[in-house]
Amino acid sequence: MLFASFDFLLFFLPVLAAWWALRQRPWARTAVVLAASYFFYMASSRPVDGSLPTPWYFAGLLAFSTVLDYVCSARIDKLAARAEAGADPRDAARKRNLWLTASVVGNLSLLGYFKYTNFFLEAFTDVANGLGASWVAPHLELMLPIGISFYTFQSLSYTIDVWRGKLTPEPSFLKFAFFVVFFPQLVAGPIVRASEFLPQMHVRPRLRLEDVNEGLFRIFKGLVKKVVLGDWLAVAFTDIVFDTPGSYTSWENMLALYGFTLQIYADFSGYSDIAIGVARLLGFKIPENFDRPYQARNLGEFWRRWHMTLSTWLRDYLFFPLGGSKGSAARPYFNLWLTMFLVGM
């Protein structure tokens, strides 16, 4: 289900109406949008041509990640409380680390299995054949769950923040599940931090004219980027050139490359604008994701302006824990290389 589709409009209007109609009943309101988010996720996961049904386990993986991080963070917090109450701090720290490890391994194992299993099987086949063996690895029929990187990073950062003592775990499983699967940003971001989102769930929502105006403006802005600019560039120019590049001059191919950079920006930032606008109509503020990246003066500034919620996530949960810019003269470059390598993977 694409944002820029009539199907999404038919989905969103009843959800919006139910959300505000149930504003005096927080539990029911949250449960309705939580169920709607799962429906949206499954509908968005269906192949565009409809040739295959959406695997049922897509929703199961999302639920598993939610339950895993809810349980792990609760146990981490309870162990920290026991240590403060006089329990053996070393034993508590060891057990807290084990629960954090369970969250990290559980989440990243699923992400790695679906994204890289066939990649490594094919690589092993190529290496074996290069060494003279006739072994051929099986190709697994795996469909990559849509948005798995985004919701994995989002739920994992919650557990890490609890482990660091920066966040008190959410006692309500319903609200935590809502945070993980909130449909406007579930499929392609922005990646939301629990410290920014969960406090908004503990405030009774108010339908304000400011939110309506901003929400509608961001949706309109995103649709113009996505449909008028991004889709038009693809249909009218870039796809045509890339289909038969040998039929065009070097200048036309170069223009197509520049056109494609504009196309992917319009697609991605347009989607983020719509997500921000839809969330705003529901009374939630989620972070900006793009800040005019093509006006950056260098690559470092471009990185900070493009998909900002991902770049800050990688900085806070990968680059800094590796040591950041500290250490020997070569260490910062290794940390940066490893971060970029993992991003590319």
Predicted regions and their residues:
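Membrane-embedded transmembrane alpha-helical bundles that form the catalytic cores
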Residues: 1-345
